[in-house]
UniProtKB/Swiss-Prot annotation:
Entry-listed glycosylation sites: N35, N53, N102, N127
Similarity remark: Belongs to the LAMP family.
Gene symbol of the encoding locus: Lamp5
Signal peptide (UniProt feature, chain positions): 1-29
Lineage summary: Eukaryota, Metazoa, Chordata, Craniata, Vertebrata
PANTHER family linked to this entry: LYSOSOME-ASSOCIATED MEMBRANE GLYCOPROTEIN, LYSOSOME-ASSOCIATED MEMBRANE GLYCOPROTEIN 5
Biological role stated in the UniProt entry: Plays a role in short-term synaptic plasticity in a subset of GABAergic neurons in the brain.
Name listed for the protein in its UniProt record: Lysosome-associated membrane glycoprotein 5
Entry GO CC: cytoplasmic vesicle membrane; dendrite membrane; early endosome membrane; endoplasmic reticulum-Golgi intermediate compartment membrane; endosome membrane; GABA-ergic synapse; growth cone membrane; late endosome
Species this protein is from: Mus musculus
Keyword Transmembrane carried by entry: yes
């Protein structure tokens, strides 16, 4: 009898230890997500950080706005008029996320879950003439909106929750190990579950890295979008041309000064032969 009791007690202890170990493993591998938007000097830009095991694995800074068309009744209550709701991602939003080796996700909720933005990032490898090349991109976007939310929707004909999404985007393409940066506005079209409606997502002041972050809370080297590179070239080109023009002017003045000095030191030969007798 004592042996059975001891065996049962031993089994219970083992189960308790296994449960404790399982909980500890879940806690260690748990990912925490932080909304650091209050640190941004731009009131329209949000900052989100996903950390795993105490290390940053996803960072995202951006300003987001959604242009959502919806129908309202005309004054005759017969015809329909399409209005547009402009919904901005606000500070203080609730955020979730997870990091993976080839897939990472960021999910943001605001206005009491009336709006949800889900962004899926994918890392892929491609064969090129230079060999295998890895890149990451924004692969999917889901935007859930509730037309019963009265701040942005004024007397809509249909009150419902809709999903606007875009699959296989391949947007924000960036070499692996780098962050993506773009100050210019970028638009992404999302097909809505509200028939014949297209939601426009506008991103700006973007700086994102969903993979391969080396230093905690620090972006890796930036991969700038083509629009930013063009604007940077347009800003620096006049400066470069001005420097070249200034250098040409300085060189011209130096050559003129040297030439003038050399000609001034040469003996002047008189053209009038009567003056030769005064020479010597």
């Amino acid at each position: 009898m004592d042996l059975r009791v001891r065996t049962l007690l031993g089994g219970d202890r083992l189960r308790i230890l296994l449960m404790f170990f399982h909980v500890m493993v879940q806690t260690v591998a748990e990912q925490e997500v932080e909304n650091l938007s209050g640190l941004s000097t731009n009131p329209e830009k949000d900052i989100f950080v996903v950390r795993e095991n105490g290390t940053t694995c996803l960072m995202a800074e951006f300003a987001a706005k959604f242009i959502v068309p919806y129908d309202v009744w005309a004054s005759n209550y017969v015809d329909l008029i399409t209005e547009q709701a402009e919904i901005s991602l606000t500070r203080g939003a609730e955020v979730k996320g997870h990091c993976g080796h080839n897939e990472s996700e960021l999910e943001v909720f605001w206005v009491d879950h009336a709006y949800t933005l889900r962004m899926l990032f994918v890392k892929e490898s491609h064969n090129t003439s230079k060999g295998p090349e890895a890149t990451w991109n924004l692969n999917k976007v889901h935007f859930v909106y509730d037309s019963s939310e009265k701040t942005h929707f004024k007397a809509p004909v249909k009150v419902n929750k809709y999903i606007a999404s875009s699959h296989h985007l391949s947007a924000l393409v960036t070499p692996a190990g780098m962050s993506y940066e773009c100050q210019a506005q970028q638009t992404i079209s999302l097909a809505s579950s509200d028939p014949q409606k297209t939601v426009t997502m506008i991103l700006s002041a973007v700086h994102i890295q969903p993979f391969d972050i080396i230093s905690d809370f620090v972006f890796s080297e930036e991969h700038k979008c083509p629009v930013d590179e063009q604007e940077q070239l347009e800003e620096t080109l006049p400066l470069i041309l001005g420097l070249i023009l200034g250098l040409v002017i300085v060189i011209t003045l130096v050559i003129y000064h040297i030439h003038h000095k050399m000609t001034a030191n040469q003996v002047q030969i008189p053209r009038d032969r009567s003056q030769y007798k005064h020479m010597g």
